[in-house]
Design a protein with these regions (language model features):
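N-terminal single-pass transmembrane signal-anchor helix
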Residues: 1-19
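Intrinsically disordered, low-complexity regions enriched in Pro/Ser/Thr/Gly and acidic residues
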Residues: 81-237, 246-250
Length: 250
């Protein structure tokens, strides 16, 4: 009887260990797939904003996809040529796409940046998206967000400049003003339509301030080194483009 119980206990131990090992392997594989997927989506954000639709499927027995709100105060203030100060843009939250799995699959639980740079203003459109991963309260979480500003400035003539600011966020698939649409977890579709865009243009602009939470970015921070706008003969045109990407997770 003792021998029988010993055999049963050993068999159960082997069974549970094997099940745990298979489960852990599945978790690692699925999370790795979603991690690569988020990286590819982040890399493709410029193409999506130009009208390309992305549709992918992924294994989803253990990993789940969704979204979260990111509280953020983003304000763009402009001083126009007639000394008028206007708030050209204001936004208090962004949406991040998220993936999560209820176990730790990270080598470093402090987390890391998978793609992009953690900056408030970027000068490359490819850096508009940020992907980071971290461990929190029993979950390994990966997030993709576009909560930053892309600035591109061009010199036109001797002392005239044209500044384009692009801001992007995620929205609902059937109603762009809603949060990202989540009705499942096995696939993700992202698309952008030009009529989603909100475009404003201001000229002449004497100064510019971007408030990003506690950070303040001025025109001097955006202008290339050794460049300045002549207060008499120079001019600055600012174009602000706000785009929303429709998301369907199903």
């Amino acid at each position: 009887m003792i021998l029988f119980m010993t055999v049963v206990l050993i068999s159960l131990s082997i069974f549970f260990f094997s099940t745990f090992s298979v489960d852990a392997t599945t978790a690692s594989v699925e999370y790795g797939y979603v991690k690569s997927l988020f990286r590819e989506i982040a890399f493709s954000i410029p193409e999506i904003l130009n009208g390309q639709t992305i549709y992918t499927r992924h294994p989803s027995s253990l990993v789940s996809l969704g979204f979260k709100k990111i509280p953020l105060n983003l304000t763009i203030q402009l001083e126009l040529g007639n000394n008028t100060l206007v708030t050209a843009f204001n936004k208090t939250e962004f949406y991040a796409l998220t993936g999560g799995i209820r176990r730790n699959v990270l080598e470093d639980v402090r987390g890391s940046i998978v793609y992009g740079v953690n900056q408030s203003v970027v000068s490359e459109i490819e850096r508009l998206a940020l992907v980071r991963e971290y461990y929190y309260n029993g979950w390994t979480i990966i997030e993709l967000d576009t909560a930053r500003v892309y600035c591109s400035i061009y010199k036109v003539g001797d002392s005239n400049y044209y500044l384009e600011i692009i801001i992007a966020d995620f929205g609902g698939y059937y109603n762009i003003n809603d949060p990202p649409t989540v009705i499942g977890t096995g696939s993700i579709r992202l698309r952008y339509e030009s009529y989603y865009a909100d475009i404003k243009e201001f000229s002449p602009v004497r100064n510019l301030t971007i408030i990003f939470n506690q950070s303040i970015i001025t025109l001097k921070d955006i202008l290339p080194s050794n460049h300045s706008i002549d207060p008499v003969s120079g001019s600055l045109t600012v174009r602000i483009v706000y785009k929303k990407i429709a998301v369907l997770i199903s």
